[in-house]
Amino acid sequence: FLPTAHGFDEFYGNLYHLNAEEEPELPDYPKSSDFPNFAKKFGPRGVLHTFADGRIEDTGPLTKKRMETIDDDIADRSVEYIKKQAAAGEPFFLWTNFTHMHMRTHTKPESLGQAGRWQSPYHDTMIDHDKNVGQVLDAIDAAGIADNTIVFYSTDNGPHMNSWPDAAMTPFRGEKDTGWEGAFRV
């Protein structure tokens, strides 16, 4: 099920939705004292770096703390990949999957408040997300390949109602997991 088993040369990221990555830190997660092998057998695998030759590097769990900065890591790795591929002069495909703005949003402490008074950590993290996207776009420009590059930016689904007013489904009806426009408008 790894992307590298389906045509990708390299993959760096997590294989689960973010809420699954948080589960081992929740108070009702099965305790290792009661279920010694539960986390190893059923828990999330964390952040993997995999390669088409079958190598798999486990870079560690995607904890709530790591979620604050994982997108910085993904942006840096994306930039390095762009530089490497552009220098080789070969066409390439890069699929960069940032974790923000997925619910739950974990904001790094130094970013709290950057959106200004009356704003939330969600807004602070949106600024960080914008910086990460900008970093990747700047790398394309710096590599001199912008005129021969297609960039497609999207999200996987609409917002959750419980993230209102930040979710921005208004004025559309519905939310994630419904058949209405608010679920699909991205």
Give short role names for the model-derived ranges.
Residues 78, 92-97, 126, 133, ...:
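Beta-strand elements within well-structured catalytic alpha/beta cores of enzymes
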Residues 66, 70, 88, 118-125, ...:
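Conserved acidic
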Residues 14, 20, 118, 123-125, ...:
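Extended substrate-binding grooves/exosites of carbohydrate-active enzymes
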